[in-house]
Amino acid sequence: MKEQKVVETKNLRRFIKKLEIDTYGIADMHLLKEMETGFPIDLNNFLNMFPYAIVLGAQYGKLGKKASGGKTALFLEEAAFSIMEYLEDKGYRQLIIHTEDEFDPINRLGFMSLKLLAKKAGLGWQGRSLLIISPEYGPLHRLIAILTDLPLQNNQLIKNQCDDCRKCIEACPQNALTFVGFNDHPSRREDVLDIKTCLGDNGCLVCILSCPWLKKS
């Protein structure tokens, strides 16, 4: 199995490289099991069918002609469907996870947490605003994932580098963020973010623009 994982991972990475994806990683779904007590689905039902997640990320504003219609979301979706066809041709299951897959729009809960998948796939760490922060792109990127049963090697995790930084918390115009000094993931989203006062769905980008990692990237 280990040798198969090595071979399949190399082949998949070679295929993804042709798609010109900014960043991507692989997560072992079993790593999520103990992480999220308030997860909106029962992960046990998925572990046998979809033990791995392939997570793709694209930075906003740097896609140029790569994106159909200039839209990051569409570019990522096209890449994801190409990977799904790749998996189908090899005889493996595939299930796409979108940002828009909300089953609880009021509380902005998705079918599955893309942020959690991205973190476990080594794309970045979860910042004080709960956004995924990539060393290369900061918090300014979009995510999509494909779940599969193709045996793969998971990426190494990236250590949380926010430390005691509170820039996003202090900049939030709605005071929707509370500082919680977690290293990996807070036990509850509500401890960090008041989702009902957050203006993210209305185009507010303050927590993104105030992040020092955006400037570094």
Language-model-derived ranges and their functions:
Residues 1-72:
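Non-catalytic, usually N-terminal nucleic-acid engagement modules in DNA/RNA processing proteins
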Residues 65, 69-217:
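Catalytic cores of enzyme domains
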